[in-house]
From Swiss-Prot:
The lineage of its organism: Viruses, Monodnaviria, Shotokuvirae, Cossaviricota, Papovaviricetes. The keyword S-adenosyl-L-methionine does not apply. Belongs to the papillomaviridae E8^E2C protein family. SUPFAM superfamilies: Viral DNA-binding domain. This is Protein E8^E2C. The keyword Glycosyltransferase does not apply. Transmembrane segments: none annotated. Residues 60-69 have a biased composition (Polar residues).
Length: 172
C-alpha cells in the first residue's frame, strides 16, 4: 500500500527531487501528509489530494407509488366460468393480439427472418429474447392488429415442429 501511495505521489509531481531514499519517502507518506523540504511538488493542492468517489444519485422511493398511479385504468379481464369475456374483447386500453413462438434461439432467429415475405400478416415482430431463469428456450413475440389477422398468419405460416406457438393478448 505504501509503495502504491508513493507511485501515486510520484505521478502527481511534475518536478520531484530524488535526494531522499525510497524508504524515507514511503515512511513520510504513510505517517504524515506534510512535505519534506528536500522534495518539492509543483502543482495545485487539489491535484495532490486523492479524489473522492462520486456520490450516488438518490432515486425516488418507489414504495409510495400505488399500482393505480402507473396505469390509471381499472380494466380487468375476467376469465371465470360465468364470464362472457373470452379474451377477445378490447377495452378502453390499447390491447394487441400476440403470438409467442418458443424454441431454440437460432431456429427462432432464422424463422423470424422468413417473416419478411409476409409483412402484411403481422404488425410487429420482436427480436429473439428469453427469460433470465430459462436461457435455453428463446421467445419471439409477434403483434397483430386484429384476431382475424392473427388467424390468417397462423394458417399461412408453416411453423417448424421444434417451435411451440402460444396465443395471447397484451396490453400496450
Amino acid at each position: 500500500m505504501a509503495i502504491h501511495k508513493w507511485k501515486l505521489w510520484k505521478q502527481r509531481c511534475s518536478t520531484c527531487s530524488d535526494a531522499l531514499s525510497t524508504t524515507t519517502t514511503v515512511e513520510q507518506l504513510s505517517n504524515t501528509p506534510t512535505t519534506n523540504p528536500l522534495t518539492t511538488c509543483v502543482g495545485a493542492k487539489e491535484a495532490q489530494t486523492q479524489q473522492r468517489k462520486r456520490q450516488r444519485l438518490t432515486e425516488p422511493d418507489s414504495s409510495t407509488i400505488s399500482p393505480l398511479s402507473v396505469d390509471n385504468t381499472n380494466n380487468q379481464i375476467h376469465c371465470g366460468s360465468g364470464s362472457t369475456n373470452t379474451g377477445g374483447h378490447q377495452s378502453a386500453t390499447q390491447t394487441a393480439f400476440i403470438v409467442h413462438l418458443k424454441g431454440d434461439t437460432n431456429c427462432l432467429k432464422c424463422f423470424r427472418y422468413r417473416f419478411t415475405k409476409h409483412k402484411g400478416l403481422y404488425k410487429n415482430v420482436s427480436s429473439t429474447w428469453h427469460w433470465t431463469s430459462n436461457t435455453k428456450t428463446g421467445i419471439v413475440t409477434i403483434v397483430f392488429d386484429s384476431a382475424h389477422q392473427r388467424e390468417t398468419f397462423i394458417k399461412t405460416i408453416k411453423v417448424p415442429p421444434s417451435v411451440t406457438l402460444s396465443l395471447g393478448i397484451m396490453t400496450l
